[in-house]
């Protein structure tokens, strides 16, 4: 696998990290939990609650921030979309479109096909939809949150509608 990644050319990369305000909110929640833990108890209860709840908060925020969106080109010229652990060759994408913030709710609502591959991050306002034409794959389309959907689709090299 290491030799495969060395031969791939990175065309686009995006880390989907949680907003800074989430870290501030988590710090406030950790402080409240620690303060409540020491009420009527020795001071060590404050420190234990601070360390435990702080570690859990940091782990949760890092866990939510782990998704990465990349577009690469392999040595044969095939472009690939990587979203988290999934990989999609551009050759199976029939058409693609940018979903603006105003249409995000509709795209994620009743119209959503249960067989679709969805990577949704609530704090990212825009999405990209890639309709697939692959007889070997039952997935009708990919719906992914991305900060720059136009750039992702342009780098993938497929028609944008």
Model-derived features with residue positions:
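N-terminal membrane-targeting/pre-transmembrane regions
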Residues: 1-41
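Hydrophobic, well-ordered secondary-structure segments
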Residues: 2, 7-8, 48-49, 70, ...
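A generic structural signal for short, non-catalytic loop/turn and secondary-structure boundary residues
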Residues: 4-6, 62-64, 123, 137
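Hydrophobic alpha-helical transmembrane segments
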Residues: 39-52
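Conserved beta-hairpin
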Residues: 52-97
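Short strand-connecting beta-turns/loops that link adjacent beta-strands
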Residues: 76, 135-137, 149
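Cytosol-/stroma-facing membrane-proximal "stalk/adaptor" domains immediately downstream
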Residues: 140-161
